Amino acid sequence: MIPLQHGLILAAILFVLGLTGLVIRRNLLFMLIGLEIMINAAALAFVVAGSYWGQTDGQIMYILAISLAAAEASIGLALLLQLHRRRQNLNIDSVSEMRG
């Protein structure tokens, strides 16, 4: 059995790594990957806490978070494909210069 502190520290490290990738990178694909890492870190924290207290709620929240991440990834990748077809790059600065 993994102690609660170890699991939560791992989840916090993963969350900070995802947040760092989201803030530092200017490529939308890497920003999407960072967001996925953050969602998985939060889901890991739910599973660790649920395991510690002997509840199945953490696993239920994990399933919900994974389904949310799948929906977010599919929409994000569809937007990335359209952006790449129109602009031929995935730089966030080119998105902010849209017409309209």
From Swiss-Prot:
Entry EC number(s): 7.1.1.-
Main location: membrane
GO cellular component labels: NADH dehydrogenase complex; plasma membrane
Parts of the chain that traverse the membrane: 4-24, 28-48, 60-80
Any one GO MF annotation of this record: NADH:ubiquinone reductase (non-electrogenic) activity
BP term (GO), one: ATP synthesis coupled electron transport
Subcellular location: Cell inner membrane
UniProt entry keywords in alphabetical sequence: Cell inner membrane, Cell membrane, Membrane, NAD, Quinone, Translocase, Transmembrane, Transmembrane helix, Transport, Ubiquinone
HAMAP family: NDH1_NuoK
Quaternary structure, from the entry: NDH-1 is composed of 13 different subunits. Subunits NuoA, H, J, K, L, M, N constitute the membrane sector of the complex.
Family, per entry: Belongs to the complex I subunit 4L family.
Annotated protein name in UniProt: NADH-quinone oxidoreductase subunit K
Organism: Cronobacter sakazakii (strain ATCC BAA-894) (Enterobacter sakazakii)
Gene for this chain: nuoK
